[in-house]
Amino acid sequence: MVRTINETFLKACRGERTDYVPAWYMRQAGRSQPEYRKIKEKYSLFEITHNPELCAYVTKLPVDQYNVDAAILYKDIMSPLPAIGVDVEIKSGIGPVIDNPIRSLQDVEKLGEINPEDDVPYILDTIRLLTTEMLDVPLIGFSGAPFTLASYMIEGGPSRNYHNTKAFMYAEPKAWFALMDKLADMVITYLKAQINAGAKAVQIFDSWVGTVNVADYRVFIKPAMERIFAEVRTMGVPMIMHGVGAAHLVNEWHDLPLDVVGLDWRLPIEEARARGVHKAVQGNMDPSFLLAPWSVIEEHVKGILDQGMKQPGYIFNLGHGVFPEVNPDTLKRLTTFIHEYSKGQLAK
């Protein structure tokens, strides 16, 4: 069954005019929700993501609670890595841990290929369930970017400085480019499968790429990103790029064949546009503001919206994920304010 959905988010992604500014929030499904915390008392991340009914419920929760204009699939960026031979364990209080980190070209050559229908059928089943039976807003599929995935694979887990990753990039360029190619192939196949299953847009998260300078990005990372976006673009859905602490790279992203440039709070929207970013923009509230009094939040959000609405193609989001400490009522109130304020301003 084909469901009728609210396409405001998709219109904004395409740079079209909308009646109001669409909004969704990174990590909108997660630790800030009491319902989610109850589920996590009984089930692990692995168990939730491997159970399509449970995962679909978690994914849809913020749509029902906050009235956001898009859902994003609840899963981890590490989800596809076991399929290519990477042993990943999500450890509480630490994050992803990999016991067999990449150290050589031989390690890279041992990596396999992903076959989503065989390797991650539960993810595709979750997407099908959501898009055929549950959602009246678009579902966003996603993947980690090659650099961020490689950083976990080389460091063996989270890092503060990514010294091992960048040292590998500089000292072993042949192995590095082989790894980028392997990961680009995986991301392309993975995203296409999500789209075929029903995702109406996709976002690529490059969480740690801000540690790389512009010159190195152009040489060591951008070619893989160009290939990913060019190949996935043939699927005909909007594509979003997001990184953290990477304001110096927004023009590099703008050059890629994508639709939406994601911004964090470090770069004002009007400054990004002054630098030549003329594609659709998503962002860019500092999630720390969500812990402030409502009067402070409202004034801050007005400023962001006033910048974003100056040209068509704007999606409100946070610059990073929702904190566990955020009151769900604040997010609900925020969405209502974004919709009402922007509708009034755009009608003038």
Swiss-Prot record:
Listed PANTHER family: METHYLTETRAHYDROFOLATE:HOMOCYSTEINE METHYLTRANSFERASE RELATED, UROPORPHYRINOGEN DECARBOXYLASE
Family stated for the protein in its record: Belongs to the uroporphyrinogen decarboxylase family.
Oligomeric form and interacting partners: Homodimer.
Protein name: Uroporphyrinogen decarboxylase
GO molecular function: uroporphyrinogen decarboxylase activity
Keyword Cytoplasm: yes
Pfam (any one): URO-D
GO cellular component: cytosol
Binding residues for substrate: R27, Q28, A29, G30, R31, F46, D76, Y152, S207, H320
Catalytic activity annotation: uroporphyrinogen III + 4 H(+) = coproporphyrinogen III + 4 CO2
Cellular localization per UniProt: Cytoplasm
Residues annotated as site: Transition state stabilizer: D76
Documented EC number(s): 4.1.1.37
Keywords from the named record: Cytoplasm, Decarboxylase, Lyase, Porphyrin biosynthesis
Source lineage: Bacteria, Bacillati, Bacillota, Bacilli, Bacillales
CDD domains documented for this protein: URO-D (cd00717)
Pathway membership: Porphyrin-containing compound metabolism; protoporphyrin-IX biosynthesis; coproporphyrinogen-III from 5-aminolevulinate: step 4/4
Keyword Transmembrane part of the UniProt annotation: no
Function summary: Catalyzes the decarboxylation of four acetate groups of uroporphyrinogen-III to yield coproporphyrinogen-III.
GO biological process: protoporphyrinogen IX biosynthetic process
Residues that span the membrane, as ranges: none
